[in-house]
Amino acid sequence: MDKIWRELGLTDEEYEKIISILGREPNITEIGMYSVMWSEHCAYKNSKPLLKYLPTKGERVIQGPGENAGVLDIGDNLAVVMKIESHNHPSAIEPYQGAATGVGGIIRDIFTMGARPIALLDSLRFGIPDDKRTKYLIENVVAGIADYGNCIGIPTVGGDTYFEESYKGNPLVNAMCVGIVEKDKIKKGIAKGIGNPVMIVGATTGRDGIGGASFASQELSEESEEKRPSVQVGDPFMEKLLLEACLELFETDAVVAIQDMGAAGLTSSSCEMASRGGVGMEIDLDKVPLREKGMTPYEIMLSESQERMLVVVEKGKEEDVQKVFKKWGLNAATIGKITDDGMIRVIKEGKIVAEVPAKSLAEDAPQYIREEEVPKWQEDVNKLNINEVKPPEDMNKALKDVISSLNVASKEWIYSQYDYMVRTDTAITPGMDAAVVRIKGTKKAIALTTDCNGRYCYLDPYIGSQIAVAEAARNLCMVGAKPIGVTDCLNFGNPEKKEIYWQLKNSIFGIAKACETLQIPVVSGNVSLYNENEEGAIYPTPVIGMAGLIEDVSKICTMDFKKERDVIIILGENKGEIGGSEYLKVCFGMVKGQPPQIDLEEEKRLQELVLKLIEEGLINSSHDISEGGFAAALVESAISGKKGAKISLQTSLREDVELFSESPPRALITVSPEKVEEVLKIAYEYQVPAQKVGVVEGKKIAIEVNGKKIIDLPLEVLEESWRGRIKWEMERN
């Protein structure tokens, strides 16, 4: 066993700590159990000391971080359950299964809480699709998500996708799931009741995914290709049966505690449940239903075979459980019992093959506060002299270039592969500011979004992360939803590098600041580190998943222009910032400058104003101004509503900056002519600048600045550029 712990990702110091916990040298199975439970993926050992700065309390919070998912009270004895998780490393190696099992895993996190999943979202990051490998990754990640979600019958209603060079070879696949549960039916993973039986339910256990959690805690390299067995294989039809069987089981009083088997499989589910409950657990591996012959204790304990759950059952109710699972054609086997000594004791063929304290696996992983320093290149990339950027001679071309850029263009090629209408509750479909899903039997709806501009976070992780939170909240407000909770997925490079740790720390502080100011608690989340390729780390990408509550679904608002002659109004102020903008990258090939600065109090006022205007029925459309600036937002609203616009701007800014600056917080709204004065009056009361800039009319976009016509383009030409870009990229050789 020469230094085998190193191969499994443990340091020599960590190995010494294990010896002192056990009072002896661990055997191979025990080393394996510690290696997965103490991996970054399971233990958050580089991020936990920072995560405590996030605000996790709020009047709606029923369950914050620490369980399988977060839970928020939405009234009427109902709660929304939400969680986002990454499946980045598996998707880089085996994109179809990596993405599919990412979806499967996050769905299990939701129904293990007792909730019925109602929606999926996906936040995706890819390299530029100009080579075969990148296209292969994109095609297969999207197909993996689509097939799993479509087969299990849960609508994929939204998400976000960005393409940047930094994600080449290390795509980000962050899957978010949301469910609804009656408040008194929430289930938790807290084992209790000495002598209560422990059952494994669902699929059989095979060799797939062994050591996947430790694999997800390393940088990708050439050798990663050899780790394909670390990627699990998903079966959405099996998961559909498991979902229905579990929800039916929850209607009985047989379940004491339940946990899905995700990363680290039987090891994590057993030690986490036992540790939360302050108890021990004895497991007999001869009773685990296996799908392969000759599996060792190490393999059974570390298998990440999908579609399995571990259940602690009330003593004497085992048959009730078996009856339910038999009906759905699934396994339910009693494999152990709860003990009072706090140990995870694993038995095979009558012999003890592993015996370790549950708490030491689940809670005692070392935590690291790393050294940090500002990256050497940071000062250089933050320099931007606007005078070096010559305004384009042809503004029509500049507009077409910006709206057909990969990050602004329509993502229809992606979301058209998803069934977003299954379950028939989707009220706002993908492609809008936020998705909206009705809650059956009520007037309520939940609005959902994921947001993060990694480029902003690369230029300034503190400000960029605040913008991610602010934009997610603004997107929800645009459809008439009040933001109620965040689930975040922090995607970064190797935290052992000082500049990466600096990015991670500043990003978390930025999220904390924005969530505190906007009063939105973080209820769940995930950290994915070591996201690097040969060139270095990905852009820091703290993806913000957010849910908002709509009390009356009949009052939702969308971004499409509704009526000719409606007046177009910009809310908020253009501060003339173009650092980190899509315009700067697309038209000049530059990723430079400071990201736009954000005043969170200003943001709060704008969001409250938009919610008020929607609630009062005073506006016909609303759309947030972000990537691509005012010009892109205008084109998107026009294309969505199949109506043009005539715009006249008065400004002291340069024409291109007026059109393409991404200064937050801003929104584009349309108002019936007779309601304009009232809207302007209310905006004044909320201290939000509001400027009439034009009207909805015709079939083209015509813009003049300070009396000079600078843009005049038919809507169909713009639509072709905007709608066709990604499809064209994916189909060209």
UniProtKB/Swiss-Prot annotation:
List of residues binding Mg(2+) 2: 109, 260
HAMAP family: PurL_2
The protein's name in its UniProt record: Phosphoribosylformylglycinamidine synthase subunit PurL
Biological process annotations from GO: 'de novo' IMP biosynthetic process
Quaternary structure and interacting proteins, as annotated: Monomer. Part of the FGAM synthase complex composed of 1 PurL, 1 PurQ and 2 PurS subunits.
Function summary: Part of the phosphoribosylformylglycinamidine synthase complex involved in the purines biosynthetic pathway. Catalyzes the ATP-dependent conversion of formylglycinamide ribonucleotide (FGAR) and glutamine to yield formylglycinamidine ribonucleotide (FGAM) and glutamate. The FGAM synthase complex is composed of three subunits. PurQ produces an ammonia molecule by converting glutamine to glutamate. PurL transfers the ammonia molecule to FGAR to form FGAM in an ATP-dependent manner.
Catalytic residue positions: 41, 87
Residues the record lists as binding substrate: 86-89, 108, 232, 304-306, 528
Gene: purL
Residues binding Mg(2+) 1, per UniProt: 85, 526
Binding site for ATP: 44, 83, 488, 525
Recorded family membership: Belongs to the FGAMS family.
Matches recorded under NCBIfam families: FGAM_synth_II, PRK01213.1
MF-aspect GO terms: ATP binding; magnesium ion binding; phosphoribosylformylglycinamidine synthase activity
Chain residue ranges for the region called Disordered: 212-232
